[in-house]
Each structure stands twice: as structure tokens, then as C-alpha cells.
Regions:
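Metal-ion/cofactor- or nucleotide/acyl-coenzyme-handling active-site neighborhoods
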Residues: 1-172
Length: 172
């Protein structure tokens, strides 16, 4: 397993599109995917089914762990990696939020995604399928929400910690 620092600057001046777990994930289409794509938890299943040509990352920060089919797997050492007994997948990169990004380990995946975008060298982050932020809808696609009321604060948490411009877009 490699460490996340090996991906430093790999996507310099590109846009990172982060795909959340909101109900609108069911309406996601290939044309919504711009630049480098990073999915959160099980959103990888929907995105990989679209067969994008974009560079694709699967962020697995917590216990809602899903193996991708082809995407580069990004595993949080304290949560996701601790939940599984070894990793039988390549390519995989591990990270520790406190060590690598100097922020609290228990911040939500949307915050960590922006920090990964900064590490990659991206110029901005666009969030899709984060319906709690765009519409106030805390329903999720495919599996039940973990902390639905917390989702409503994700936008503010990202804004508070962001180092590059971020944008939240609706899927129509």
C-alpha cells in the first residue's frame, strides 16, 4: 500500500468533481463528470457503472467501505483501514487526516475530499449529489443515511476548511 503523499501534484490545475451519496446520485449521468472524479463511499458503484474516461478515485473514509472495480482506492487509516482485514486491491493509497492534512480525523468525507484536491494540485472542487447542501434533502441513494442532520452542516464545514474554491451543484 502506498501513501497519499505519492499523489502530490498529480492533477495540477485540474478540476476535482466530488460525487456524494445524496438521492440525486440516481440521476447522475456521464456528462456531469468533469475533470478528475472522486466518489464518496458507495457512490463509486454508480460512477463506475457509467464507465467514465476521467481519472477516478474512490474515497473510503469510514466504516461504509466499498471496493471499487477499477478506481484508485483512497483509504483512511484510522477508520476505513481499521474496519477491514487487509486490502486485496490495487492501486490503493492510505492517508491519515491528522498527519497528512492537519485537521481533525472525524471531519466528514466532503472536507477530506477538498484536502485531497489540494494535495492533487487541483484548482477548484465541484460537489455533486450532495443534496443536503444544495436542497436541504438528507435522503441518500442506495443505503440509509448515517447522520442525516449532520449532512446539513457539510457545506459550512467545507467552506470553513477549504483552501481552494469550492462549488456545490445540483443534478437536474
Amino acid at each position: 500500500m502506498k501513501t497519499i503523499s505519492e499523489l502530490s501534484g498529480i492533477h495540477n490545475d485540474e478540476v476535482l468533481t466530488v460525487i456524494g451519496r445524496g438521492k440525486s446520485l440516481g440521476r447522475l449521468r456521464l456528462e456531469h463528470l468533469d475533470g478528475v472524479v472522486m466518489t464518496i463511499n458507495h457512490a463509486i458503484k454508480v460512477v463506475e457503472s457509467l464507465q467514465p474516461d476521467n481519472p477516478l478515485y474512490s474515497l473510503q473514509k469510514d466504516h461504509l467501505f466499498f471496493y471499487p472495480q477499477k478506481a484508485t482506492l483512497l483509504l483512511h487509516e484510522r477508520e476505513a483501514l481499521a474496519e477491514i482485514d487487509g486490502v486485496d486491491y490495487e492501486p490503493v493509497y492510505s492517508f491519515d487526516v491528522e498527519r497528512d492534512f492537519k485537521i481533525r480525523w472525524n471531519l466528514p468525507s466532503v472536507v477530506i475530499a477538498e484536502k485531497l484536491g489540494v494535495l492533487f494540485g487541483c484548482k477548484r472542487v465541484v460537489y455533486l449529489c450532495c443534496d443536503a447542501v444544495t436542497d436541504g434533502n438528507t435522503d441518500t441513494f442506495g443505503i440509509p443515511p448515517t447522520n442525516p442532520r449532520d449532512y446539513l452542516f457539510h457545506g459550512e464545514l467545507v467552506r470553513k476548511h477549504a483552501s481552494i474554491p469550492v462549488e456545490w451543484k445540483r443534478i437536474t
